[in-house]
A protein has these predicted regions:
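A short, exposed helix-loop element centered on a Lys and neighboring polar residues
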Residues: 147-148, 191
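Short C-terminal tail/terminal secondary-structure segment
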Residues: 3, 9-17, 121, 258-290
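Substrate-binding pocket helix/loop in short-chain dehydrogenase/reductase
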Residues: 122-124, 128-133, 227
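Canonical Rossmann dinucleotide-binding motif of NAD(H)/NADP(H)-dependent dehydrogenases/reductases
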Residues: 18-58
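Catalytic loop of short-chain dehydrogenase/reductase
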Residues: 163-185, 190-199
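C-terminal helical subdomain
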Residues: 5-12, 17, 206, 225-257, ...
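Alpha-helical segment proximal to the catalytic Tyr-Lys
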Residues: 152, 195-199, 255
Length: 304
């Protein structure tokens, strides 16, 4: 084995290439199955995919029933999952959920702050303050509390990965109000945590999600077509498209990446409204935009 291959081998460790997260233990928030099943949420997809890649996964959700539904999917596929339920914006609930996860999994290596609410948009003169405050509590306070209670366990594990889920609404004006402000805050916190806890070998990174077809997004066909036209690829993503980059950021493959914002948006933020307008007037036809997302991609099986 030459020097380069030996170095690469030391970086890869003993991980099975088909199980990139073997031995990892992850706490994923907002990972319950959406009411009624069907369209897959981002947290659910991340939890299921992490487990399929060899991680033990704690599925955290405000609903015990929804968390248990995701764990059933994980366990039925031969993975290791445990459900924890509570309001993660409550310090007491958050601390309890993290401790339950640690007891069940034997520790933590990875945290995914995904739980979020939309709402609180519009003019400051008319916005519902109760909605605004609830969005900020769930989207920002819950992430901070999860990090607060999980970081000591990541330290105990010798380091780990914090993956925060943000949105292009953080940097593009979409009229999203509190949601946009909360996601901008998440990106700022990501950089701070990367700075403060790098000495603990804890990495913090952010996935910045574009126009994905999820329960939280636009689901009517006209809206979906507008969103496809708003990307450079002429397509919309699904939850798996966010879950795969999360696997990378949780794995040792990303061991030298911290403090980064990773856009997963089909190029939506790589250009301007004028660039998109020019692209769509250049002869790109509906047939070149890619097919509508078939029902099979909202199933519970990771796409490859």
């Amino acid at each position: 084995m030459d020097r380069v291959e030996a170095d690469n081998q030391s970086r890869r460790g003993d991980a099975d290439p088909g199980h990139r997260l073997s031995g990892k233990r992850a706490f994923v928030t907002g990972a319950g199955t959406a009411p009624g099943g069907g369209l897959l949420g981002i947290g659910e997809a991340i939890a299921v995919l992490f487990a399929s890649q060899g991680a033990g996964v704690a599925v955290a959700d405000v609903s015990a029933e929804r968390a248990a539904a995701t764990v059933s999917l994980i366990n039925d596929a031969g993975g290791e999952g445990v459900a924890v339920a509570g309001d993660l914006s409550s310090e007491a609930d958050n601390a309890r959920c993290v401790e339950e996860a640690v007891r069940a999994l034997g520790g933590l290596d990875t945290v995914v702050n995904n739980v979020a609410l939309s709402g609180g948009g519009g003019s400051p003169t008319t916005v519902d303050l109760d909605v605004w405050e609830r969005v900020m509590a769930v989207n920002v306070r819950a992430a901070m509390l999860t990090a607060r209670h999980a970081i000591p366990h990541l330290r105990h594990s010798g380091g780990g990965s914090i993956i925060n889920i943000s949105s292009i609404a953080a940097t593009r004006a979409l009229g999203a109000g509190a949601y946009a402000a909360s996601k901008a805050a998440i990106q700022a916190l990501t950089r701070d945590w990367a700075l403060i806890h790098g000495q603990d070998r804890i990495r913090a990174n952010c996935i910045v999600v574009g126009h994905a077809y999820t329960p939280m997004g636009v689901t009517d066909e006209a809206g979906r077509e507008r969103r496809r036209l708003a990307s450079l690829l002429g397509t919309e993503g699904v939850a798996w498209d966010i879950a795969w980059p999360a696997v990378f950021l949780a794995s040792d493959e990303s061991r030298w990446i911290s403090g980064a914002d990773l856009p997963v948006d089909a190029g939506a933020t790589a250009t301007t409204a004028l660039g998109i307008h020019t692209l769509n007037r250049s002869g790109r036809t509906d047939g070149e935009l890619g097919p509508s997302i078939p029902p099979s991609t909202s199933s519970t099986s990771p796409v490859t």
